[in-house]
Regions:
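C-terminal, non-catalytic "cap/extension" segments appended to globular domains
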Residues: 18-35, 61, 67-70, 115, ...
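Active-site-proximal, well-structured secondary-structure segments within enzyme catalytic domains
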Residues: 155-160, 195-356, 429-440, 446, ...
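C-terminal motif of bacterial Sec signal peptides marking the signal peptidase cleavage site
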Residues: 14-16
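Active-site recognition of the HExxH zinc-binding catalytic motif
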Residues: 361-381, 402-406, 457
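Post-HExxH zinc-binding segment in Zn-dependent metallohydrolases
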Residues: 231-241, 394-432
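Post-HEXXH active-site segment of zinc metalloproteases
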Residues: 213-214, 218, 359, 380-407
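N-terminal helix-rich structural modules
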Residues: 23-193, 502, 509-512, 565-568, ...
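Active-site scaffold of zinc-dependent metalloenzymes
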Residues: 173-176, 180, 335-363, 374, ...
Length: 607
């Protein structure tokens, strides 16, 4: 009898448990359905409003007419409308309440709801006047930056003209004039930057962030301290190599400019880049003079060749609208308006309307840049698919976009690739160590600029409320500490040299994306070279390899619908690490140490 009673009790319990399970499943489905309705409506409106805002923003970047504020006014209105939607209380309240039951939701729903709140934090509806003021200030700052008229000795010059002078000019006095001309724009941007700092900080504080830097870092699922520690870790790992490069560059540049006393810090106007972020043009590799080959091409060939590369990997041809709507080439000298000359890729409608803004001329820099920008374009096209909601049509994180674009630019510059295109003679002899040195002067030199000067300046600007009378002092302290460079003459606080870098104004508090992207690109490239192509990572040829194309497309296609760490581990088998980058440049250390024998090392030790 007792046995039967136990069995009966068990059956009752099982029946009750079954009912509970069924009820719970029904309840979970009901909440999931409710969330899905909310998200579907949100995604539709988000896509619509972003399309309008992107079109308005596009005009402010491609047609800057002095004295005509119509594009700016239209852009302000479109951005305010988008901000009012993403930051409205209905969306914030719903996303917040749904996330309280996130254990009942699908992972994709949870990701979207968190994205809703992240986007709301920059535009909270409770602070509408503040958001409108920020949008207006951002539009004006962009117009002031890109509408600026550069002059050398009173003569109008373009940003490209200045870059060419810094690349080719041998006379130090003329170089200094060009460098100083490039910094004049900062004077008029300083007050706007301080205003934007305050507006950006106050805006995100409305949803609980301490400052704008913390807000931007949070997209990685990290705290500010965690991000800073990771950046410093990468910087320290690459420090020994950069120290050798810095010493080598000081002595070689002093020799080039016939300066007897080698300075401890490299004068900025000695370098071929306005911010000292890329020194690669200091080295010419015999047998790989791409510029001379490209002189016979026109600007359109450069971009079309980039498309042919992606198509060879199995990607589709670019949409017809890309060619119709993009702004790819420099304006004629007699143009009645200006444009932003900084290369960028645009995802206009979060679907197939993709565009690029460039000023392509047939040289090696624009050749590499075009391959890079098309990397963004194909990333957009890959994740614009029914499996990825509009909210998550982004890179796995912001660094992924830059990593894949930069990787394709690097792949297009490798010797076997260029030989395949007859851009350099087949089986041409070149100095492999000089090639590696040239690459290091790009990729390695960039790390202290991005992780140090830029990221630490913006950290101090937003997280420490850097005072207006210390902006230039702090900028050059960081440039000395991390890059080992100095201005050609004293730069007082009437200047704002940081603001001459476009990202400080219009892509704020996220320049570390580029640093992380370089680490990531070498990790992914190393995997492709060794596991798919079975080639030396220094001498690869991606061209025409469909397996490489599929591997890259598989990373691109999920967009932000999968965790970035999961994507990396799944595709490469390891977590984010600078090891592949260190391995790639390891042959260079012995060479540089030999070159630097008897030379004085002056780069500051990193603490």
């Amino acid at each position: 009898m007792k046995k039967n009673l136990i069995l009966l009790t068990g059956l009752v319990a099982l029946f009750a448990c079954g009912n509970d399970t069924s009820n719970n499943a029904n309840a979970d489905k009901a909440i999931q359905d409710s969330v899905q309705t909310f998200l579907s409506n949100y995604n539709t409106k988000y896509q619509e409003k972003n399309t309008i805002a992107n079109e308005a923003s596009w005009l402010t970047q491609t047609k800057i007419v002095e004295g005509d504020s119509s594009n700016a006014i239209a852009n302000n209105k479109a951005q305010e409308d988008l901000a009012a939607f993403t930051g409205n209380s209905f969306n914030i309240d719903n996303a917040t309440n749904y996330l309280k039951q996130q254990e009942k939701l699908t992972p994709l729903q949870v990701k979207q709801l968190k994205s809703v709140l992240y986007k709301a934090a920059n535009n909270p509806g409770t602070l509408q006047d503040l958001v409108k003021a920020r949008i207006k200030a951002e539009t004006k700052q962009t117009e002031d930056l890109f509408g600026f008229e550069f002059k050398i000795d009173g003569k109008k010059v373009s940003a490209n003209d200045i870059d060419e002078k810094l690349a080719d000019e041998k006379n130090l006095e003329k170089r200094q004039k060009a460098w100083e001309a490039s910094k004049e724009v900062g004077k008029g941007l300083k007050n706007g930057l301080m205003n934007l700092r305050d507006l950006r900080n106050k805006t995100v504080q409305g949803l609980g962030y301490n400052n704008y830097f913390e807000y931007q870092v949070s997209e990685y699922g990290m705290t500010t301290d965690e991000m800073v520690q990771m950046l410093q870790k990468f910087n320290k790992e690459l420090y020994p190599l950069f120290r050798e490069l810095h010493t080598y560059a000081r002595y070689e540049l002093a020799k080039k400019y016939k300066v007897k006393e080698v300075p401890e810090l490299i004068p900025s106007h000695w370098l071929p880049n306005r911010w000292g972020q890329d020194w690669s043009s200091l080295v010419d590799v015999e047998g790989i003079n791409l510029d001379s080959a490209l002189k016979t091409k026109d600007a359109e060939w450069i971009v079309k060749q980039g498309e042919r590369f992606y198509v060879s990997l199995g990607f589709p041809e670019l949409p017809k609208t890309f060619w119709e709507k993009s702004d790819l080439y420099p304006l004629p000298k007699d143009a009645k308006y200006k444009k932003n000359n900084h290369a960028s890729a645009w995802h206009m409608d979060y679907d197939k309307d993709v565009r690029s803004l460039m000023s392509v001329t047939p040289n090696s820099e624009w050749y590499e840049t075009s391959h890079h920008e098309l990397g963004h374009i194909y990333y957009y096209l890959c994740y614009s698919n029914p499996e990825v909601p509009a909210l998550l049509r982004e890179g796995a994180n912001r660094a992924y976009h830059e990593a894949l674009g930069s990787m394709m630019g690097m792949a297009a510059m490798q010797k076997p690739f260029m030989e395949n295109l007859d851009l350099i003679p087949k089986n041409s002899k070149s100095d492999e160590m000089q090639t590696l040195l040239k690459e290091a002067l790009n990729y390695v030199v960039f790390i202290p600029f991005s992780t140090g000067t830029m990221s630490m300046f913006e950290h101090d600007l937003y997280a420490k409320n850097l005072p207006a009378d210390q902006l230039n002092k702090r900028w050059w302290e960081l440039a000395a500490q991390y890059q080992g460079i100095a201005p050609p003459a004293n730069r007082g606080e009437e200047y704002c040299d940081a603001a001459t870098k476009t990202h400080i104004n219009d892509d704020p508090a996220q320049y570390y994306d580029y640093a992380l992207s370089f680490v990531l690109l070498f990790q992914v490239h190393d995997h492709i070279a060794k596991n798919i192509l079975h080639q030396d990572p220094h001498n690869t040829n991606y061209y025409g390899n469909k397996e490489v194309g599929k591997f890259i497309a598989d990373i691109m296609t999920p967009g932000a619908s999968k965790d970035w760490r999961e994507v990396l581990k799944e595709k490469t088998g390891s977590d984010l690490s600078a090891k592949a980058m260190l391995d790639y440049f390891s042959p260079l250390m012995d060479y540089l140490k030999k070159q630097n024998e008897g030379r004085k090392y002056t780069l500051s030790e990193l603490k």
